[in-house]
């Protein structure tokens, strides 16, 4: 897989910064209020993290042990994450999307962006 961009968190907010060759893919995105961002848990892309299948009580009111597929844990066989985010602004010329929040670190690779469609998501 080849990342299409990265997450940038700074004093101005949270941004998705696209690689130049993917900027044309932003066309008409401004017609949507939210996007699904698929990103890579790059800080947990280690063999030992990829072998974790169960985790202890990740949620305060959850069961004592849960399978990783029932959690948002970064420790999983394929460290892929999905976050729905509200679009604040898009800049098609610069390849930027400002969003309200992403639970990803600065520099995190972004794998894909899809419009959030309530009837499908």
List the model feature ranges, each with a label.
Residues 1-84, 88-121:
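Glycine-rich, low-complexity intrinsically disordered segments
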């Amino acid at each position: 897989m080849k990342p299409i961009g990265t997450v940038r968190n700074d004093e101005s907010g949270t941004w998705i910064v696209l690689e130049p060759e993917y900027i044309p893919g932003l066309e008409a995105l401004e017609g949507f209020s939210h996007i699904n961002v698929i990103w890579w848990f790059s800080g947990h892309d280690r063999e030992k993290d990829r072998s974790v299948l169960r985790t202890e009580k990740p949620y305060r009111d959850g069961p004592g042990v849960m399978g990783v597929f029932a959690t948002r844990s970064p420790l999983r066989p394929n460290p892929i994450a999905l976050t729905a985010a509200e679009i604040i602004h898009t800049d098609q010329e610069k390849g930027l999307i400002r969003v309200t929040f992403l639970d990803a670190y600065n520099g995190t690779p972004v794998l894909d962006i899809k419009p959030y469609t309530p009837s499908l998501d």
